[in-house]
Swiss-Prot record:
Positions with a binding annotation for substrate: 241, 263, 266, 333, 366, 420, 425
Pfam families cross-referenced by the UniProt entry: Histidinol_dh
Described purpose of this protein according to its UniProt entry: Catalyzes the sequential NAD-dependent oxidations of L-histidinol to L-histidinaldehyde and then to L-histidine.
UniProt organism field: Corynebacterium glutamicum (strain ATCC 13032 / DSM 20300 / JCM 1318 / BCRC 11384 / CCUG 27702 / LMG 3730 / NBRC 12168 / NCIMB 10025 / NRRL B-2784 / 534)
Binding site for Zn(2+): 263, 266, 366, 425
HAMAP family reported in the protein's UniProt record: HisD
Protein name: Histidinol dehydrogenase
EC number(s) stated in the UniProt entry for this protein: 1.1.1.23
GO biological process: L-histidine biosynthetic process
Cofactor note: Binds 1 zinc ion per subunit.
Active site: 332-333
Homology family: Belongs to the histidinol dehydrogenase family.
Catalytic activity: L-histidinol + 2 NAD(+) + H2O = L-histidine + 2 NADH + 3 H(+)
Keyword field contains Oxidoreductase: yes
Length: 442
């Protein structure tokens, strides 16, 4: 089922590896002309425009953008107790990890009386997008909300698409997760129009704009984020989900097959890639996938994803080459199924998250490992990171020099002012001291 790319007997460069690897992705540029008028209309007409587009695209128009408090409360009250227990346990685990991510203020003394202090200031108001589509994602509510709360974000709003089968409001499980987390502002709006409304708000409708937008979504959500970036901050662009498994002959073929299938379940564009130095394992995994995918509830979606050009098996000479390949692929999720898996994992530099050993599968990270599941895709893990408490914090420097400390470094500043032909900079220093030479004399 999975196509095979054979890199054995080669010494490929980074460029060669990137060209050879199966890779999906979405062409965001192609939908920008569709999304831009939506964003501009929502900027001009606010909530009414957002509701109009929801009715046009999704054939549903909620009674209001903001979900009433009683609807949110009812969703929590009717939540399945087992689902509630799982949500609460995942919140506990994710909160424990993200609470420890918060950095501490620190001060550096450059000279007596001259200090620079770095403080970490939370974003004031954040919009968290939770998609609808093929599945219900209360886990995304957790993964976006908890790090923002741990960072100290003052105001949170969740936006999620309205559902016709639920009275035009977001899915009750989404609303229940919001309620459990203490998020009482939820907007029943999805797609690019949700991103635009979060960015620009609507004063007349009582919808305050945000300072940052995070959360995964489809290509239209991604395009809208690109269009409003600069008006607000955004997290990294999220393409279709992906898993890479780096495995040797010691790997359990059944478990590897299940992990590849589980990621393919998300989306027909999802990528599932096995990187291995064992031809026998490759054959075994392909056989196990063929035997097992059809019994999953989402078999048709899984089959299309696994047969797509974005999925496949990559054969390499040895695990050291496999590490190079994995680094160039820079997977959203990377599983290590090798001997000495931790030692291999420590050699990886590019991945959204690394899952070490047979008992650390990606589905654990999707829900309750404690790590975050909002991760960079499409190779962007080479230069970006997943969602964390850091995402919602801004480092701000406080520069504090007394007279002696400034005088000690004043000539350095004046010399730079001369070199850059910005004499007023030097004069701003000299004016504070009587005996310093003028900028021209320095």
């Amino acid at each position: 089922m999975l196509n095979v790319t054979d890199l054995r007997g080669q010494t490929p460069s980074k460029s060669d590896i990137r060209r050879a690897l199966p890779r999906g992705g979405t062409d965001v540029w192609s939908v920008l002309p569709i999304v831009q008028p939506v964003v501009e209309d929502v900027q001009n007409r606010g909530a009414e425009a957002a509701l109009d587009y929801g009715e046009k695209f999704d054939h549903i128009r909620p009674a209001s953008v903001r979900v009433p408090a009683e609807v949110i409360a009812a969703a929590e009250n009717t939540l399945d107790p087992l689902v509630r227990e799982s949500i609460e346990e995942s919140i506990r685990r994710v909160r424990k990890v993200h609470a420890e991510q918060k950095p501490s203020e620190h001060t550096t003394e450059l000279s007596p009386g001259g200090t620079v202090t770095e403080r970490f200031m939370p974003i004031d108001r954040v919009g968290l997008y939770v998609p609808g589509g093929n599945a219900v994602y209360p886990s995304s509510v957790i993964m976006n909300t908890v790090p923002a709360q741990e960072a100290g974000v003052n105001s949170l709003v969740v936006a999620s698409p309205p559902q016709a089968e639920h009275g035009g409001w977001p899915h009750p499980t989404i609303l229940a997760a919001c309620s459990i987390l203490g998020v009482d502002e939820v907007w029943a709006v999805g797609g690019g129009q949700a991103v635009a409304l979060l960015a620009y708000g609507d004063d007349a409708a009582g919808l305050e704009p945000v300072d940052m937008i995070t959360g995964p979504g489809n290509i239209f959500v991604t395009a809208a984020k690109r269009l409003v970036r600069g008006v607000v901050g955004t997290d990294s662009e999220a393409g279709p989900t992906e898993i890479a498994v780096l495995a040797d002959a010691s790997a359990n073929a059944v478990n590897v097959a299940y992990d590849l299938i589980s990621q393919a379940e998300h989306d027909v564009m999802a990528a599932s890639v096995l990187i291995t130095d064992s031809e026998q394992l490759a054959k075994d995994v392909n056989r196990e996938i063929e035997a097992r995918y059809s019994i999953t509830r989402n078999a048709e979606r899984v089959a299309e994803a696994l047969r797509g050009a974005q999925s496949g098996i990559v054969l390499v000479d040895d695990i050291s080459v496999g590490i190079q390949v994995a680094d160039q692929y820079a997977a959203e999720h990377l599983e290590i199924h090798t001997e000495n898996a931790r030692a291999v994992a420590e050699q990886i530099t590019n991945a959204g998250a690394i899952f070490v050993g047979d008992f650390s599968p990606v589905p654990l990270g999707d829900y309750s490992a404690g790590s975050n599941h909002v991760l960079p895709t499409s190779g962007s893990a080479r230069f970006s990171a997943g969602l964390s408490t850091h995402t919602f914090l801004r480092p701000v420097n406080l520069i504090e020099y007394d007279e002696a400390a400034l005088k000690d470094v004043s000539q350095v500043v004046i010399n730079f002012a001369n070199a850059e032909d910005l004499p007023a900079h030097g004069e701003a220093i000299r004016a504070r001291f009587e005996n310093l030479p003028t900028t021209d004399e320095a």
